[in-house]
Amino acid sequence: SAGIVKKAGFTGVQIHGAHGYLVSQFLSPLHNQRNDRWGGSIENRMRFVMEIYRAIRKEVGPEFPVGIKLNSADFLKGGFSEDDAAEVVTALASEGIDLVEISGGTYEAPAMTGNRMAKSGEEAYFMGFARKIRKTVNVPLVVTGGFRTSDAMAAAMEGGEIDMVGLGRPIVVDPDLPNKILSGQPY
């Protein structure tokens, strides 16, 4: 499908490795109970996403951007942890992934919709993990989840903690939001 996307004129493709979908299930020790080469250790559990990435890269070539949306953690007891996520990001970075979008949670434990700001004291939910991973890999980072003001978005980018801000729900509510922010309107 990545080859079809490229032929159709899209400018990149993203693997959805978050929120409890199939790739995320392979990565999670809670959901992945396999006892073969696809389960157990983080090396085995990430084999699925690594093979997907390699197949996509082979299909689209080195110049076509390939990214991944990945949980920083799934926030389930015995599930995918920040340490697991750091290993996956490091492995993908070593293979040439072009972008990592950091999110978190599953539909069982929806951190991407909860009020983590009150706990962390900061607006965006996953900035702590972004800071941690920024120190170990040189890959463009996106954080999605919890940004509610243009000041927080600007501070995260100007501080070099992330390279892009991911917006989902705010743009559904106001499709012209990016233009408003760029024109200096408060958000």
Question: Residues of each region from the PLM?
Answer:
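Flavin-dependent oxidoreductase catalytic cores
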Residues: 1-187
